[in-house]
């Protein structure tokens, strides 16, 4: 009997200790908490509710640029809290959101107190189908008939839209192209690279 107890003792110790942690085993990292929804009163007395952008991909679609929507008031008071980590400055008809690695140029919507056109360059914007800066035109699943040559600051660039989505525009640079006419589809497939987005506020027209 005594001998059986001696043999059983080490087994009891092992059971009590349980399985040992493997050295160097990585422990799961907790995800950062999601930004809290912010509620403020707009200048016209309406309730302005949004989730601030604090990092990661800036999601774009027909209805919004991150926390900016067509109903967003065009004012520093409305835009600054939407981008708490960015430098936000401007006046009159344009507000600049400088995120360090990317810029949002926000125009006022003429005749209203709301945001209008928004130009997105740099940073980590992402379109509704995963479109990202530096993407090739050939990989963006765009239709050639929905593209046109840019003007003014977009001269020699090519601007495209997706079917039924006139608000979000894709701006492509075409290295070596200096003409004021639309390059052929073959040239776009070979050279065109996504350099930015334009989100048209108000009633978009080409």
Predicted regions and their residues:
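Bacterial N-terminal signal peptides that target proteins for export
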Residues: 1-7
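Residue-level signal for mature regions of secreted extracellular proteins and peptides
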Residues: 10-11, 153
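C-terminal motif of bacterial Sec signal peptides marking the signal peptidase cleavage site
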Residues: 13-16
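Short helix/turn-capping signatures at newly exposed starts of structured segments
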Residues: 18-154, 161-164, 181-206
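Internal interaction segment
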Residues: 157, 165-173
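Surface-exposed, gly/pro-biased binding rims or lids
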Residues: 171-185
């Amino acid at each position: 009997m005594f001998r059986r107890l001696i043999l059983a003792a080490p087994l009891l110790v092992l059971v009590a200790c349980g399985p040992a942690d493997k050295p160097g085993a990585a422990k799961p990292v907790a995800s950062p908490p999601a930004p809290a929804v912010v509620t403020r009163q707009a200048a016209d007395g309406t309730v302005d509710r949004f989730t601030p952008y604090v990092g990661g991909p800036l999601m774009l679609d027909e209805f919004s640029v991150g926390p900016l929507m067509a109903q967003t008031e065009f004012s520093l008071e409305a835009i600054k809290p939407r981008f708490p980590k960015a430098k936000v400055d401007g006046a009159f008809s344009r507000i600049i959101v400088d995120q360090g690695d990317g810029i949002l140029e926000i125009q006022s919507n003429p005749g209203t107190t709301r945001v209008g056109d928004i130009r997105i360059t740099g940073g980590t914007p992402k379109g509704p189908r995963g479109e990202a800066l530096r993407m090739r035109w050939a990989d963006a699943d765009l239709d050639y008939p929905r593209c046109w040559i840019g003007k003014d600051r977009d001269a020699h660039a090519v601007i495209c839209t997706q079917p039924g989505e006139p608000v979000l525009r894709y701006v492509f640079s075409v290295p070596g192209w200096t003409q004021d006419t639309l390059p052929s589809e073959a040239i776009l497939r070979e050279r065109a690279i996504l350099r930015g987005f334009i989100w048209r506020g108000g009633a978009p027209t080409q």
